[in-house]
């Protein structure tokens, strides 16, 4: 685990302990059972593919550790509706506060504003966070293989699947891919950002995608800015893309989303 992830785990463990004191697991699980049913994250992506379209997981992100504040006029419901109007298949909402200025209530607000399935984008280290995600309406959770050992990843995945949610398993090297393939979830996200240096290159996806069995559902993450980037990744059978920063910086998010997904556009890549 990188030093960055170790620091994140330290504050996350403190957050989890405080949350457990405020709301015991049994109470949280009861809330999760009463929450709005999962909308089907993987199903929404496959529906886009069945229609011959790319599938976009559009991210609602206010800030990041590497870039600082990304969008000052940050309004999750407005952004969520803009993404849906632009053709997104799903939403991803940052809920981590210390590093991303996110919040669980941002996810609740974004989901309530649309009919799209929503990913809770956060660093999960405990199955308590899975129940927390479902209680707040999440349809999918994220497992970051760089942050977890195999046993913890399997426990978190099982808790999510048992609750009816989908799981996006994130990897960024061959070792993490081999470990991810031992899990049950079909979605494998290849993060083009090096979690140690924060540098991004689409070459990461190009190297790892051919190693993933065809029955898995590949997602390209980070470093994706233009239709040319989507075309480049599609050459290695990646048809689903998680994009946040490049869209969040646009004045007209709906128009930017439509432009990104336009297959006939081919401006030079801005990702490298």
Curated annotation (Swiss-Prot):
Catalytic activity from the UniProt record: 1-(2-carboxyphenylamino)-1-deoxy-D-ribulose 5-phosphate + H(+) = (1S,2R)-1-C-(indol-3-yl)glycerol 3-phosphate + CO2 + H2O
One of the Pfam families matching this protein, by short name: IGPS
Enzyme Commission number: 4.1.1.48
GO biological process: L-tryptophan biosynthetic process
KW ATP-binding (keyword) present: no
Protein's recorded name: Indole-3-glycerol phosphate synthase
Gene transcribed to yield this protein: trpC
Family: Belongs to the TrpC family.
GO molecular function per UniProt: indole-3-glycerol-phosphate synthase activity; phosphoribosylanthranilate isomerase activity
Alphabetic keyword roster: Amino-acid biosynthesis, Aromatic amino acid biosynthesis, Decarboxylase, Lyase, Tryptophan biosynthesis
Pathway: Amino-acid biosynthesis; L-tryptophan biosynthesis; L-tryptophan from chorismate: step 4/5
Gene3D superfamilies: Aldolase class I (3.20.20.70)
Taxonomic source organism: Bradyrhizobium sp. (strain BTAi1 / ATCC BAA-1182)
């Amino acid at each position: 685990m990188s030093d960055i992830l170790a620091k994140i785990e330290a504050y996350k463990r403190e957050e989890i302990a405080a949350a457990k004191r405020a709301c015991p697991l049994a109470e949280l699980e009861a809330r999760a059972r009463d929450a709005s049913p999962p909308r089907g994250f993987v199903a929404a992506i496959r529906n886009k593919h069945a229609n011959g379209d790319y599938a976009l997981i559009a991210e609602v992100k206010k800030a990041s550790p590497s870039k600082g504040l990304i969008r000052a006029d940050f309004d999750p419901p407005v952004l969520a509706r803009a993404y849906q109007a632009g053709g997104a298949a799903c939403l991803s909402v940052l809920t981590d506060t210390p590093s991303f200025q996110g919040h669980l209530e941002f996810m609740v607000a974004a989901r309530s504003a649309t009919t799209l399935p929503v990913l809770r984008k956060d660093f999960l280290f405990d199955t308590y966070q899975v129940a927390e995600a479902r209680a707040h309406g999440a349809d999918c959770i994220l497992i970051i293989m760089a942050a977890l050992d195999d046993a913890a990843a399997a426990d978190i995945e099982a808790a999510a699947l048992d609750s009816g949610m989908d799981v996006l398993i994130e990897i960024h090297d061959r070792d993490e891919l081999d470990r991810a393939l031992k899990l049950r979830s079909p979605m494998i996200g290849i993060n083009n950002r090096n979690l140690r240096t924060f540098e991004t290159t689409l070459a990461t996806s190009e190297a790892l995608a051919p190693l993933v069995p065809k029955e898995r559902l590949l997602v390209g993450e980070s470093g994706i800015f233009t239709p040319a980037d989507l075309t480049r990744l599609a050459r290695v059978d990646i048809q689903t893309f998680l994009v946040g920063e490049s869209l969040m910086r646009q004045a007209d998010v709906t128009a930017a989303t439509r432009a990104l997904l336009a297959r006939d556009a081919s401006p030079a890549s801005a990702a490298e």
